[in-house]
Amino acid sequence: MTTTNAVKTKNIGYITQIIGPVMDVKFSPGKMPNIYNALIVNGKNEAGDEISVTCEVQQLLGDNKVRAISMSGTDGLMRGMEVLDTGAPLSVPVGEATLGRIFNVLGEPVDNLGPVANKSTLPIHRDPPAFTELDTKLSIFETGIKVVDLLAPYRRGGKIGLFGGAGVGKTVLIMELINNIAKAHGGVSVFGGVGERTREGNDLYQEMKESKVINEENLSESKVALVYGQMNEPPGARMRVGLTALTMAEYFRDVNNQDVLLFIDNIFRFVQAGSEVSALLGRMPSAVGYQPTLSREMGTLQERITSTKKGSITSIQAVYVPADDLTDPAPATTFAHLDATTVLSRGLAAKGIYPAVDPLDSTSTMLQPWIVGEEHYDTAQRVKQTLQRYKELQDIIAILGLDELSEEDRLTVARARKIERFLSQPFFVAEVFTGSPGKYVSLADTIKGFLMILSGELDSLPEQAFYLVGDIGEAIAKAEKLKDK
């Protein structure tokens, strides 16, 4: 969807060259479009079928020519075809009408549910908020998920990296966060699927409908808007789909004054698409073949994700690490922007501990005593120390057994196993599958529960009482039930 200032005067050029998704277009002298302007190619292919392709101007070449990158396939395009300069960047629909819908990079709905009702649109290329508008207070974004809030808390308006392989619960964690921000913060979420599998996008949509994150009967009650630019799309679409999702999120923050969660899956694919476009435009590659503009492209996206005095955008970004090499320029550039990392562990998932967030690998810059308070900080450190000691003792236990440990170490192991189980939690969005009602646990209740375990007050309770419960009161009640049995 594009806004049209220049359409009245019909600034029309024609295609002079097509190389894959890149095309050169010649305009009349003095009628050159600006960088980032959207161009539309309308015409018919040789079979007589209508073609409509949107491109974005990337370079001004001289001799009245521009080089543009296509946002969809260029099949059927020919030299000499007319190209219309819209006179403005790509613009996409924003507002409540986007909730419950799936869009492509152009802001066109692709869910077969008809056109979008509202008429508000915004350009995808926008400046980040001015310094004077930023909210500089360091505040925690409470998620209601114990392991996250206690050990790797999210910053309101911050950026979080989500690391994890296939099948360890990334999608369920994402859906729970979408659900909790709607219930606890009255906020909405925008999901940007950047260069990932179409099947995964479809699975996510179906799961969101099942768990009522998307309400089919009344779309306005949905909690999320979806924007997809999957891996079968041309690099131009994959490079810009993150900006489309971000623009929709900015509207909820700046106009509706809401707290917004922005999910980007996967931020590595955004860099990868930029690398492909850079090569197609003939730029000299930088380290490891990446684009020379890598840091600027990443900064342009990340600097728009922030808290203002009106609302906040908190972003959770899945990070693929190529060949597990953390020094690769793509993940290394991403790390510079992150406030916290949530690492999902296959070992914990195998034990049935969900969410399978690794308590020792996950980190946050917010876990400082002057930000979260002394009690929270001390509790988190003691929990980590206990779990770390348990990890060190596991080899000894495997070889010699528990009986060979000292009394103190046996107590540490018993408490660590309770802590490990108490870090699990039933999710609202998993109710359909587990039959257990979901639980939102406040930060105060989380700290209180872990302090009680660490102090030894609950040493007499069986460890299974702590598995998949909400607050500590539930664990005590569960222990009573187990005793009665």
From Swiss-Prot:
Tell me what topology the record assigns in the membrane: Peripheral membrane protein
Reaction(s) catalyzed by this protein?
ATP + H2O + 4 H(+)(in) = ADP + phosphate + 5 H(+)(out)
| UniProt EC number | 7.1.2.2
GO: which molecular function terms?
Answer: ATP binding; ATP hydrolysis activity; proton-transporting ATP synthase activity, rotational mechanism
Q: Which domain of life is it from?
A: Eukaryota
Residues annotated as binding ATP are: G164, G165, A166, G167, V168, G169, K170, T171
Cite the Pfam families for this sequence: ATP-synt_ab, ATP-synt_ab_N, ATP-synt_VA_C
Keyword tags = ATP synthesis, ATP-binding, CF(1), Chloroplast, Hydrogen ion transport, Ion transport, Membrane, Nucleotide-binding, Plastid, Thylakoid, Translocase, Transport
A biological process from GO = proton motive force-driven mitochondrial ATP synthesis
Q: Where in the cell is it found?
A: Plastid, Chloroplast thylakoid membrane
UniProt keyword Nuclease present: no
- Give the main localization category: plastid
Presence of the UniProt keyword Transmembrane helix in the record: no
Matching SMART domains, A to Z? Answer: AAA
A GO cellular component annotated for this chain's UniProt record is: mitochondrion
Subunit and partners: F-type ATPases have 2 components, CF(1) - the catalytic core - and CF(0) - the membrane proton channel. CF(1) has five subunits: alpha(3), beta(3), gamma(1), delta(1), epsilon(1). CF(0) has four main subunits: a(1), b(1), b'(1) and c(9-12).
Q: Which HAMAP family match?
A: ATP_synth_beta_bact (MF_01347)
Q: What does this protein do?
A: Produces ATP from ADP in the presence of a proton gradient across the membrane. The catalytic sites are hosted primarily by the beta subunits.
Q: What family classification does the UniProt entry report for this protein?
A: Belongs to the ATPase alpha/beta chains family.
**Record's protein name:** ATP synthase subunit beta, chloroplastic
